[in-house]
Swiss-Prot record:
InterPro entries: CheY-like_superfamily (IPR011006), HATPase_C_sf (IPR036890), His_kinase_dom (IPR005467), HisK_dim/P_dom (IPR003661), HisK_dim/P_sf (IPR036097), PAC (IPR001610), PAS (IPR000014), PAS-assoc_C (IPR000700)
Keyword check for Phosphoprotein: yes
Protein name: Blue-light-activated protein
Organism of this sequence: Pseudomonas syringae pv. tomato (strain ATCC BAA-871 / DC3000)
Chain positions found as S-4a-FMN cysteine: C70
Domain Histidine kinase: from-to ranges: 161-390
Domain PAS: 20-93
Amino acid sequence: MSENKTRVDNAATGDIQHQGKDIFFAAVETTRMPMIVTDPNRPDNPIIFSNRAFLEMTGYTAEEILGTNCRFLQGPDTDPAVVQSIRDAIAQRNDISAEIINYRKDGSSFWNALFISPVYNDAGDLIYFFASQLDISRRKDAEEALRQAQKMEALGQLTGGIAHDFNNLLQVMGGYIDLIGSAAEKPVIDVQRVQRSVYHAKSAVERASTLTKQLLAFARKQKLQGRVLNLNGLVSIVEPLIERTFGPEVAIETDLEPALKNCRIDPTQAEVALLNIFINARDALIGRENPKVFIETRNLLVDELANMSYDGLLPGRYVSIAVTDNGIGMPASIRDRVMDPFFTTKEEGKGSGLGLSMVYGFAKQSGGAARIYTEEGVGTTLRLYFPVDEAGLTNTESPQASDRRLGSSERILIVEDRPDVAELAKMVLDDYGYVSEIVLNAREALKKFESGNMYDLLFTDLIMPGGMNGVMLAREVRRRYPKVKVLLTTGYAESSIERTDIGGSEFDVVSKPCMPHDLARKVRQVLDGPNGIA
């Protein structure tokens, strides 16, 4: 028997009346920490001794608990997994410490910091289990209050940043739209002035669209179009982007893993993430001697023991891409916040503070992680991890747009609960030669089909009230009318990379906001596709 085991004397039984036990139980009785002793040699491992502190903590009397198992302390919010871990430790005669929600006699709950240890006699026989306990409810409440305060601080920073950026964009859009309206009322229209106003208003819309995508990326709520690709190929694709970002004065070095595995990520969002990393590296290199950027890719195996070193990545195979600069680096106080939304050290107007938060969200939503290593005066490394995908490579080049730019009077049913959004979609599609109708919910759409109206395409919003969303409607239409093509639209998608047996989404999706020519092209692609999937 191990000499580390707790022993009480050389007796061979668990008789608590034995004279040799007096010192042990006297010590347990007089301590202020709640303690109990159980007897594993009796059926159901009952409590055979409890001190006054335990009785005061739980509200029970000794007569009520002696001879019973400790499970009377459990209740509705007690974690079954923790209970099972305690049972396993007792069965294996191991020490265990755990934090668990227990219940007093009056039904109130409390957080219990529990430590259980087996007690042996000199003959090596297990005679007791000793359990010390501590009510840590105040500590838990304080931790929760701190988390809530931190959450509210982050929320305040987030909403303040959103309001600031969107108010500026609304100012631009509203101002130029007013100018266009004023120009239309004049007897002689200044066409160039109107065109300039339209250009600036559209630019503001595009910036607002980028902002919402960055926010969704941080929240891991954006719709990702996952494709199997190789990060080495991605580096080659973004080489012109790297050169434009850093210019000739920054030395670029690469070390790419020759046998790098593939991964499934959204190539467009991956390029945006790398651009954000490059921009931060470029800014960190301003004024530095011999500025240098080093890009590397690696294969990585994360096992059970190492996963906590990789921000909790699940065990498995990963690929990584890292960008290292020899810039100014950053202190720990900034490093810990650099991926928070709207946190920026740049001057007003020089950055939104969403770049690295978007990188973080994109990596997490892709099933990976983002880690930053930095040292003041030395430089910074930002490394992204993505799960390996054994599927074949997908062509990441944009498909050639169909030569059929205009509709051929195909009939489209628009399902959108926002009348203004529906009307805009109808105007766009009608302008491109389609014949479109509007309904405001899924039930009305089904009635249109049931009444004999036939359509070539169902164009429906994803999230709608009334108990039937866009996906449910699309599935029902596909079931009843298999020849009808389907295109979904949304400004918000909870799913990440959708994986199905055919390697893609069940239905094609176009994200809001969408420029008219992009919508028309997507509609054309879906109509020309064999199964409604472009």
